[in-house]
Amino acid sequence: MYEGKHIHFSEVDNKPLCSYSPKLCKQRRLNGYAFCIRHVLEDKTAPFKQCEYVAKYNSQRCTNPIPKSEDRRYCNSHLQVLGFIPKKERKKKNDPIDEVKVRHQMDTMAFSLTVPTLALKMPNGLDGMSLSPPGARVPLHYLETELEDPFAFNEEDDDLKKGATVRKKLQSKLAQNRQRQRETEILKVRQEHFSPPPAPSQQQPPQQHSHLSPLSTSLKPPAPPQGSVCKSPQPQNTSLPMQGVAPTTHTIAQARQLSHKRPLPLLPSSRAPTVDPPRTDRILMKATAFSPHFSCISRLQRLVKLCTQKHQLDTDLFPHLGLDWSEESGEEPEDSEQASPYQVAWSIRETLRYQRHASDDDDAESRSSRVTQLCTYFQQKYKHLCRLERAESRQKKCRHTFRKALLQAASKEPECTGQLIQELRRAACSRTSISRTKLREVEPAACSGTVKGEQCANKALPFTRHCFQHILLNHSQQLFSSCTAKFADGQQCSVPVFDITHQTPLCEEHAKKMDNFLRGDNSRKVQHQQQRKPRKKTKPPALTKKHKKKRRRGPRRPQKPIPPAVPQGNLSMPASVSLPVEASHIRSPSTPELSADELPDDIANEITDIPHDLELNQEDFSDVLPRLPDDLQDFDFFEGKNGDLLPTTEEAEELERALQAVTSLECLSTIGVLAQSDGVPVQELSDRGIGVFSTGTGASGIQSLSREVNTDLGELLNGRIVHDNFSSLELDENLLRSATLSNPPTPLAGQIQGQFSAPANVGLTSATLISQSALGERAFPGQFHGLHDGSHASQRPHPAQLLSKADDLITSRQQYSSDHSHSSPHGSHYDSEHVPSPYSDHITSPHTTSYSGDNMAATFSAEMPIMAQHLLPTQLEVPLGGVVNPRTHWGNLPVNLGDPSPFSNLLGADGHLLSTSLSTPPTTSNSETTQPAFATVTPSSSSVLPGLPQTSFSGMGPSAELMASTSPKQQLPQFSAAFGHQLSSHSGIPKDLQPSHSSIAPPTGFTVTGATATSTNNASSPFPSPN
């Protein structure tokens, strides 16, 4: 069995319901299928087909199912619309159309009877009535039985009320027969009724007293001029217009009747003013039986009473004749029975119009049914017009009768008539005064409230004695209430408010404030979020600085970048031993005189109370910022409470790229020395894409590299990377893994640009060879197959020669450093020579001058890139003489060369061993120039650097000249917590890269060099460890 998507069950008996897929259907399923009869077409196996009717207004096909066994194309509803089957009609209770059918034995076209047919062809014998008005020609049985006034309180006889639905037609026939007999009797005695004797009488049963009292409720109650009909002694006597009064139909009479019981065949009293001889419940009274005084006064009084009743009835229950029509009343059969004929006619006409529009395009619509509907409408309309005509004629005759009765009473009993007229006028005046009083109450009066002891001049609200401002003084009113808002001082707002929809009504002023407040919440949130970005310019404390989440960029070094064609002067940097700076003119915020422990108490308390993981908003600075010291240069924003750095990921990436770029430049400068020492021709290295940078002894020193090295390096040098980002960068001594490095302070050659308030100095150092012991053999593995010779042992210079070359190199570099420091004024830019990119495959040297007498040139194969071997002694110790309380970080830093991991990632992608030196300026001015020297080293072992040829290292002797510099005590905050995951692989970076906060700057020119020798396939022979 196929099922839809919605599988659900009944909450009553837990039986499965229709599983219609598009929407949830709660109908019962058909037996054997998972759908109801409405949605069974979703199951293609069901024996049903779809209706073929297509709507014209939306071109959608009908979705009703049709059994396949039936030979038809449309469902039942559209068969009716198309006119193939008759439409179902709701059978109304005591439908007058059915009575017409029974009475006249008409077929379905009986509704097309025209007005002449209804007036002249009726079989009830009324065709020849000449004295009755035109309205009397309407079929009485049709107008009198069902289409009556809704306020007539008509009730059928007991036999009709108790009759069942099956006996309705039979009862209707019996009632019609009785009415025909009555009409025949009326025609027989019509001449006697209009005879001169003033003794006409009217049949009036006792149960019709209340029915006849308001019968003559017209504009003027009629009164018989000659006599009256009196009832038997039990009921009160009433009089009705008799002679000379044109009869009116019983339908209009029932509009005023209040009785609960009346015989159905009873003729209208105005139509039947004659005496019915067989009746014994009525007494015929002649005018001579009473005195003239009694008859005239009593008749007039009765007319006055009827007039009063008529006025009350019209005042209270005036919506007769269709004026109380309601659309809802036509929907239910019970209400439709009480509707007036014209209401029914109007509703039928509207229905007919709607059906005309709906079926204009329907050619199969039955013409007979449309003709029938149209005739029904005209018939109802004709009946309504007849009622209006009868009512108007009756009003005229009633006024005439009243005038006659008043004239007769005044002529015979003037005093009594005068008193009666006075009473009528008094009653009319009282009614007029009451209406005027009501009008006065509606008129606005002055407010009864007082303002500062004076009467309020405003007009009062309708039906009140107070204006809008003082309406709350009226405690009985329920519409107005006081504003529920309060002012800032706690005073309750007393403005009246007309608000019946809210629990807490607000006056106009407070309502606007509330709306603005609610709207401002969202706008303020948006504004705060937009203002957070500009606020970053004002360097908030590190605790409140949010780490910016940004997609990490990959390595920015392309495979083959194109060097810039135009020299960039601002990006140049000399490849000298160090870059000095005049510390007397530049004060670095990275060496603050105010430490974390020396903070004011209030700031320290604030920092202690704020947790690290709490995100602060801008509003939280209102209490913290006023407490900060005035001199913010002494306050390090990048240092936390415990000295922990809180840098961002961007800072780490910029630092890493800068270090790699600086190391590449240093390696390039080192290549020049090694190439000259190993005897490789300069031209060959240039052809292989390796620039040789050399400087003779008589030259000014190693020439500075002036081409654009890297975008990040240029930004670092020119201040586009804010120097404060690196003001607190200090490496943990644990990163070097139990190694000792001693860095004596050296003078800083050159000057930093003026835009660096206190930047980190970048020193590009070349190889410095200082050694007093024999230089061991250095061999490259056999893959260096492009060397000049397999062994070249004879061409290899003596170690003593290497030492002499190293001494000359040191002397030349120091000379260059001193010269360059004097040539560059304070705040000047670097030299703008073009520096080739370290990432380029082809690097040419702007200076091809080689050292005089240098035989240290090396030849390398094109397949193997040049790798600068950094000579890192196992233990380098240089005492910091004269330093007050020297820290271990700068005094003794052990470097264990047995562990190759610290240097594993010092190789760049192009094969160069990366080495950098960053230094911060010292706090004191140093005028002396000292040589960087290494301490005596006792190498315990030598290890093979990963990715490098096996190399033997030799220790170097210390220099005799050391400079002692005094400086305040340093505090090195931990850097590994922030940069450990990124710089752990770069732990081979010398300690001079660690910027200091408040002590002597690390040596600017700490140099490590790589000494290479040519060998074909010899492995490294480690040095013996001297004890």
Curated annotation (Swiss-Prot):
Keyword DNA repair: yes
GO terms, biological process: chromatin remodeling; DNA recombination; DNA repair; positive regulation of DNA repair; positive regulation of DNA-templated transcription; positive regulation of telomere maintenance in response to DNA damage; regulation of cell cycle; regulation of chromosome organization
Annotated function: Putative regulatory component of the chromatin remodeling INO80 complex which is involved in transcriptional regulation, DNA replication and probably DNA repair.
GO terms under cellular component: Ino80 complex; nucleoplasm; nucleus
Name the record gives this protein: INO80 complex subunit D
Swiss-Prot/TrEMBL keywords: DNA damage, DNA recombination, DNA repair, Isopeptide bond, Nucleus, Phosphoprotein, Transcription, Transcription regulation, Ubl conjugation
Annotated localization: Nucleus
InterPro entries reported in the protein's UniProt record: Potential_DNA-bd
Composition bias type Polar residues, residue spans: 229-257, 937-954
Family: Belongs to the INO80D family.
Residue stretches of biased makeup (Basic residues): 525-559
Keyword Transcription: yes
Quaternary structure, from the entry: Component of the chromatin remodeling INO80 complex; specifically part of a complex module associated with the N-terminus of INO80.
Residues recorded with modification Phosphoserine: S132
Annotated segments matching region Disordered: 193-278, 519-574, 813-850, 914-969, 982-1027
Phylogenetic placement of the source organism: Eukaryota, Metazoa, Chordata, Craniata, Vertebrata
A Pfam family hit: zf-C3Hc3H
Numbered residues of crosslink Glycyl lysine isopeptide (Lys-Gly) (interchain with G-Cter in SUMO2): K87
Chain intervals with Low complexity compositional bias: 201-216, 914-932, 1001-1027
